[in-house]
């Protein structure tokens, strides 16, 4: 079993790495992920990656491992930055055609290898994009907007504000019509 640390290769042959049961471990700067960058506050930081290539008991070339990162996102509730921790598990089976995907064990997600060598950062970036929340938000207890969202409305202050300005409610006529029926 070969083991490469720190510097991950740009291109890989996933089938060869699986046959040799290789382990790739290292970091990748966030700035290298072009599709991920637009959803991030900034592209500083690194992604930690551990990938274990193998051929399973059924002869399926596969990779398992983890991707860890701290991604700076914009909370859609308060529009402030928050750090979103990602620890994404990977369990992919390398396939050459969509037909092969039908016979895979359920524990694997199929990954169609259309070109060989494969760009490793594309695989990592795909997994990171899948790990992102649909609507990024702080936890309610940490979000500054929560005090406005959960604030109970004081109905008496609204009525007194209308009376102070001397404005008549335009829907009060409808209330009178309802009473006549």
Question: Model-found features: residue ranges?
Answer:
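Hydrophobic alpha-helical segments of small multi-pass membrane proteins
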Residues: 69, 89-92
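Cys/His-rich microdomains that often coordinate metals
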Residues: 82
């Amino acid at each position: 079993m070969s083991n490469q640390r720190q510097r991950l290769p740009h291109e890989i042959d996933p089938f060869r790495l699986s046959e040799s049961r290789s382990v790739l471990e290292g970091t990748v700067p966030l700035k290298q992920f072009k599709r991920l960058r637009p959803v991030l506050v900034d592209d500083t930081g690194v992604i930690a990656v551990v990938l274990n290539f193998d051929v399973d008991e059924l002869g399926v070339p596969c990779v398992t491992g983890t991707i860890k990162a701290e991604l700076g996102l914009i909370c859609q509730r308060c529009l402030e930055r928050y750090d979103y921790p990602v620890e994404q598990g990977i369990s992919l089976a390398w396939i050459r055609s969509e037909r092969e995907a039908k016979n895979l064990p359920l524990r694997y997600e199929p990954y169609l290898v259309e070109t060989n060598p494969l760009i490793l950062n594309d695989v990592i970036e795909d997994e990171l994009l899948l790990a992102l929340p649909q609507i990024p938000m702080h936890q309610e207890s940490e979000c500054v907007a929560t005090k406005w969202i959960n604030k109970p409305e004081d109905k008496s202050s609204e009525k007194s504000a209308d009376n102070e300005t001397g404005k008549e409610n335009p829907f009060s006529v409808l209330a009178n019509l309802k009473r006549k029926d």
